[in-house]
């Protein structure tokens, strides 16, 4: 299954990715090994959970979880293009002891982190019941120093952030992973992405393998436009509807910033690029570059990719 996953990513539009793997150390390292050989650049997280999770994936206790996490980090240091990332599944699945421990490991090895935030109302309610002394979900991560500010941090979904939490996203330089298809499939809600972008918050796109039907980030870009129309129609008539420029930005520079100077053809940026031949798409007239990109967002055909580069290196499929 890992080979299928890696092959699918290689043939698609993605050059860099951050992944939630599994809660099993050896399996996570195997995925990292395969991604290391792919030519892509990636972060892969060992998913932490020691409570409120099925026994088949839950660690026996926080001590065992922390031991396995450090072993995974040390083993992963041998890789060059695939790096570890601290990955608590989300607050309800991690005890305070586990959160404290992985926070210390993050500091010890100077790692980024990733998790979920404000995906659905029941999850938020559970967090506020489990964690004492917090006013919102974000403060639960801040409590354990796993909410950016001093390190790169991805938070998936961010559907129900309060105004205060939106300010925290900006202040602490959080990277929001917008997963529109997942939010639809799980009936989670619609994130106010145009508000985030207009406030200068980092926003990239996620496929959310479990609740999404495709790994394609371009497909997610199209879906981001579509769900923003539903947000305008059913949630907030004052909200700005996303356009193709917003979507293309999130699919490139918006997510690329997490990896450094990535996602733009500017001087000093690393060369991640796709060579695309769209001449086979039937056309009744000539299109501008902007129109061709917008058309690509809606057609999303990997067969149009002629060549793919990551950090200047040709990806061989």
Please state what every model-predicted region is:
Residues 143-149, 193-282:
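His/Asp/Glu-enriched, well-ordered alpha-helical/loop segment
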Residues 13, 35, 86, 116, ...:
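Divalent metal-coordination and catalytic microenvironments
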Residues 8-17, 80-85, 144-152, 173-177, ...:
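Short, surface-exposed connector motifs at secondary-structure boundaries
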Residues 161-164, 170-201, 205-207:
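A conserved active-site cap/scaffold subdomain adjacent to cofactor or substrate pockets
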Residues 28-159:
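Metal-coordinating catalytic core of metallo-dependent amide/deamination hydrolases
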Residues 47-50, 119, 180-185, 209-211:
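Short, acidic/turn-prone active-site loops that include or flank metal/cofactor-
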Residues 270-317:
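C-terminal cap of metal-dependent C-N hydrolases
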Residues 1-27, 88, 92-98:
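Divalent metal-binding segments
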């Amino acid at each position: 299954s890992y080979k299928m996953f890696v092959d699918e990513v290689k043939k698609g539009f993605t050059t860099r990715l951050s992944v939630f793997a599994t809660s099993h150390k050896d399996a996570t390292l195997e995925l990292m090994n395969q991604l290391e050989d792919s030519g892509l650049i990636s972060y892969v997280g060992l998913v932490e959970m020691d409570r409120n999770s099925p026994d088949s994936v839950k660690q026996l206790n926080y001590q065992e979880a922390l031991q396995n996490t450090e072993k995974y980090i040390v083993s992963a240091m041998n890789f060059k293009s695939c790096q570890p990332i601290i990955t608590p599944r989300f607050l309800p699945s991690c005890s305070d002891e586990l959160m404290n421990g992985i926070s210390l490991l993050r500091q010890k090895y100077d790692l980024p982190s990733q998790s979920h935030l404000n995906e659905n109302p029941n999850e938020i309610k559970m967090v506020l019941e489990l964690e004492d002394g917090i006013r919102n979900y974000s403060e639960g991560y801040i409590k354990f120093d796993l909410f950016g500010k001093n390190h790169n941090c991805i938070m998936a979904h961010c559907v129900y952030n309060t105004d205060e939490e939106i300010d925290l996203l900006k202040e602490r330089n959080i990277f929001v992973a917008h997963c529109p298809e997942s939010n639809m499939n799980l009936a989670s809600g619609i994130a106010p992405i145009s508000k985030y972008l207009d406030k200068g918050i980092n926003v990239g796109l996620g496929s959310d393998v479990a609740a999404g039907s495709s790994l394609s980030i371009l497909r997610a870009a199209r879906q981001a436009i579509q769900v923003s129309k539903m947000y305008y129609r059913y949630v907030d008539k004052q909200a700005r509807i996303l356009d193709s420029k917003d979507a293309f930005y999130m699919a490139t520079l918006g997510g690329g910033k997490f990896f450094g100077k990535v996602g733009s053809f500017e001087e000093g940026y690393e060369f991640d690029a796709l060579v695309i031949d769209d001449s086979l798409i039937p056309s009744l007239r000539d299109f501008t570059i902007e129109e061709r990109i917008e058309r690509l967002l809606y057609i999303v055909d990997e067969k149009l990719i002629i060549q793919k580069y990551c950090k200047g290196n040709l990806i061989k499929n």
